[in-house]
C-alpha cells in the first residue's frame, strides 16, 4: 500500500520527494509490484493540503485525474470496520492525523501484507504494520 507522501509529491511541481515519487510511480505503472493499493482517503487529504497551499480547484481536479489514472494503483474504499479501526488506532498509538490513522487501518484491514510505502515514521509505532521507506527501494 502507498500513502499520501509519494502521491502528493508526484502531482506537485516541486517537492523534495518528487524524484523518489516519480521513480516509484513509474515502477507501479509498469506493473513491477502487481496492483498496489492506496486508501481513497488520500484524495480527501490531497484536497485539504492543496487548498491550504492555495491550489486552484481546477488544479486540484487535474491532480485527482492524474492520480486516479495511474495504472496498477487501486483505491480502496473505507468501510465501517476501517472507520472504527482508524479511531481506535488514533487512541491506542496516539496518532494525531486522522489520515494516517485511515492509512494504517486500511493497511491492517484491507491489505494482505500490512505494508505501507511511506517516508512517515509514524507507521513504525503501529503494531502489525511494516513500513518501507520509498527512498530505499
Language model features: what each stretch is:
Residues 10, 31, 49-53, 70-74, ...:
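Alpha-helix C-capping/helix-to-loop hinge sites
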Residues 73-115:
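Active-site neighborhoods of divalent-metal-dependent phosphate/nucleic-acid chemistry enzymes
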Residues 104-137:
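Acidic, PIN/NYN-like endoribonuclease modules and their adjacent C-terminal/linker elements
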Residues 34, 73, 129:
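Short, conserved active-site loop motifs that form the nucleotide-linked donor/cofactor pocket
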Amino acid at each position: 500500500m502507498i500513502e499520501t507522501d509519494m502521491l502528493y509529491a508526484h502531482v506537485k511541481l516541486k517537492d523534495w520527494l518528487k524524484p523518489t515519487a516519480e521513480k516509484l510511480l513509474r515502477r507501479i505503472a509498469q506493473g513491477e509490484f502487481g496492483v498496489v493499493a492506496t486508501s481513497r482517503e488520500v484524495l480527501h487529504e490531497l484536497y485539504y493540503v492543496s487548498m491550504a497551499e492555495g491550489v486552484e480547484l481546477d488544479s486540484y481536479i487535474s491532480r485527482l485525474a492524474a492520480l486516479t489514472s495511474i495504472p496498477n494503483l487501486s483505491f480502496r474504499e473505507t468501510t465501517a470496520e476501517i472507520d472504527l479501526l482508524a479511531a481506535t488506532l488514533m487512541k491506542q498509538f496516539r496518532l494525531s492525523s486522522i489520515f494516517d490513522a485511515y492509512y494504517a487501518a486500511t493497511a491492517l484491514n484491507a491489505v494482505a501484507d500490512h505494508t505501507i510505502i511511506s517516508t512517515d515514521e509514524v507507521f513504525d509505532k503501529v503494531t502489525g504494520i511494516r513500513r518501507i521507506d520509498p527512498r530505499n527501494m
